Amino acid sequence: METPVRLWSQHLANLARAAFWLLLAVVILLQLGGSRGIDRQRAAALGQFERERSSRVIAMIHRQEGASLLGVPVAGSISIDDSEAVLRAIRLTPAEQPLDIILHTPGGLVLAAEQIAKALVERKGKVTVFVPHYAMSGGTLIALAADEIVMDANAVLGPVDPQIGDMPAASIVKAVAIKGPRNVSDEMLVLADIAQKARVQVASFVVQVLLKHMPEKQALQVATVLSEGRWTHDFPITVEAARLLGLKVSTEMPRTVYDVMDLYPQGGGTKPSVWYVPLRRAPAQAGSTSQPSPDTRPEGGNAAR
């Protein structure tokens, strides 16, 4: 016969289990509801941009978002899933219609980036890539395929030199050349062979992409600079540097692009590390100069935009 104390303990355990499952259900429902709400806002913002530009707009934005079941941050990068989605959107867009891509990415899979870039090069309508903050590595490869690149004045592109695992292909080849083939392992020799092939492949592809916008000699020079590994992989190519390379770059970034970026907040659930009071411009009156007035609501974010 069970004692009252044991019965009471079992009752508490049952209540605790029920409370746990109830809390889990509430968390899931809140996440689903919040996700649908932000998706509607994003669709509305992209729709507004399409109306402003009379174009098809595709956003490929890789943020570290709380995308998992319990809000654990998941960092994004260019993947095969991304290339499939972008190619599908391009197929659904009339050939002559302008195509605008909002691009914010650290890079990702070379194959996926090359698929997207090839599809953009083959477009008949004008292709414009907007880079509000950065488009590195594979993101730069996609940007090179555009007829025009619109960058924020402080935005950056990056080198497209291939990486073998966590190591730059150019550095692998250089290391083997310094030590000599007889003084390195078979594994390193295999890596060096793969690295050299990757360098040739990427450089060749960049040339093919750039031939749409510049002479072959210039395209070869630009491809060499971007893919030979003269810089570290995170080297920032600024607006000025991109123009010196011969890329067609504008800094006339539409306000709507920043509005779209605001709908992709940096995830993680941590306290923002950057705080500021945004300025709000008062309506201009006749005979007076409008001055920005501070919004009394402080805003915070993980990166200034």
Q: Which residue stretches match the model-derived regions?
A:
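Internal, hydrophobic cores of structured domains that mediate oligomerization or house catalytic pockets
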Residues: 132, 140-147, 151-153
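N-terminal organellar transit peptides
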Residues: 1-128, 134, 150-152, 162-305
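Catalytic nucleophile serine of serine hydrolases
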Residues: 137
